[in-house]
Amino acid sequence: MKFGPASPAEAIGGVTVHTLRQGSLVLKKGTTIGPAEVEALQKAGVAEIVVVRLEQGDVSEDVAAASIAQAVTGEGITVERAFTGRANLFAARAGVLVIDRAAVDRINGVDEAITFATLPAYKPVVEGEMIATVKLIPFGVEAKLRDAAVKAAGHGAMRIAPYVIKRVGIVSTLLPGLAPKVVE
């Protein structure tokens, strides 16, 4: 990645590093500069903005977060569209959250730019509950780091084990001297 100042016309394709407010113009951090943004910047009298550009071999924070989130997702889990480098994972059904803790540690050990956080293992969850998040700290990472995190996930680092109704029986033995109220 390369950071640096640019005129609005030179900024096309770059991503804003900071939120920019100039009069009625507001460009949020992470906005990709296109022709419409250049026109708005010029109208607002902005001469220079700081942008980041991905280099050959880099992937954007959203692409990386989405890829890693898909890799960790197992049965009973859905992934929200990645935004600002974050992909949130949700329970698609009620059940118990089962996590491969070693896979979580492997993913987090790939690089400090990649973070994977989950609820505690074996926690009961309900449908729609957020159970984990993948977050990329910088605006992008090298594709090889994303690929290493995907590989570290294995074949789904987490899943929701559904609740299953089972039949049970009770065998009760009456012993001499046992009070009847204990059995009732």
Question: Which residues does each PLM region occupy?
Answer:
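Glycine-rich phosphate/diphosphate-binding loop of Rossmann-like nucleotide-binding domains
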Residues: 154-184
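Short, mixed-charge, low-aromatic patches
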Residues: 20-28, 143-150, 168-174
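Residues in well-ordered beta-strands of folded domains
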Residues: 21, 50-52, 90, 132-134, ...
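Extended, charged alpha/beta regions that create polyanion-binding interfaces
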Residues: 55-163
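Short, glycine/charged-enriched secondary-structure capping and boundary segments
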Residues: 41, 147-148, 183-184
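Short, low-complexity N-terminal leaders and the immediately following helix N-cap/first helix
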Residues: 1-84
